[in-house]
Regions:
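Active-site microenvironments in enzyme catalytic cores
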Residues: 1-163, 167-172
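A beta-strand-loop signature enriched in Asp, Gly, Thr, and Trp
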Residues: 155-197
Length: 197
């Protein structure tokens, strides 16, 4: 997702310091505007955007996998890093800047065929991953750092990959401390087709 890619650039440029995020976000918007939402990954246009961002000293490894020819396919981590419906999601105790990442999760068999879909929360430790992409393992490979469910909707004649492509995700978080967050994302805005991933 273009917006998610921009947020990864912000984390990287902030070196994990949340207090720098707003100023960097404003600079990104000044330079990029909404230009990433219509850019097809791996296209000549994407290469042009890359060159412009390199000149502005705004290019990032995150943008490379977001709009470059090769996607990042991250298979998450060890089995204990994912939990099911109703379980508490784990946050590494060193993280002070983190957020949920609601996503569509594809259920894929051993032959690489997509057989269904479910919901997922891929917890993002922005302060850890933002310091260095080489810390992705520390940021992602933690007990209960992702949640999936409540069930896998198997594909059949009534539900398939086109339904996934049209899906709208909504997330509402209400913290015990009064914090509230409501967000949504549309699979129609994804930078790459789910089957390409």
């Amino acid at each position: 997702f273009a917006q998610s890619i921009i947020e990864r650039v912000i984390e990287e440029m902030a070196k994990g310091d949340a207090s720098k995020a707003d100023a960097i976000r404003a600079r990104c918007i000044d330079i990029l505007g909404s230009s990433l939402t219509s850019v097809k990954a791996g296209s000549e246009e994407a290469e042009g955007v890359k060159q412009a961002l390199i000149e502005a000293d705004m290019w990032s490894q995150y943008l490379e996998v977001g709009i470059g020819p090769d996607a990042e396919v991250f298979t998450k981590a060890q089995p204990m890093s994912s939990v099911g419906w109703g379980a508490d999601v784990g946050l590494h105790p060193v993280s002070e800047w983190n957020n949920p990442e609601p996503e569509i999760v594809l259920a894929v068999n051993s032959l690489g065929a997509v057989k269904g879909a479910t919901l997922g929360n891929d917890v993002n430790l922005r302060d850890v991953e933002g310091r260095s992409a080489l810390l992705l393992g520390k940021a992602k490979d933690n007990n209960a750092s992702s949640a999936i469910g409540p069930f896998i909707r198997l594909f059949d004649d009534g539900y398939g990959i086109d339904d996934v492509r049209r899906a709208e995700l909504e997330l509402e978080v209400t913290g015990e401390d009064g914090f509230a967050l409501r967000g949504q994302s549309s699979m129609s805005q994804i930078s790459r087709d789910p089957l390409d991933l």
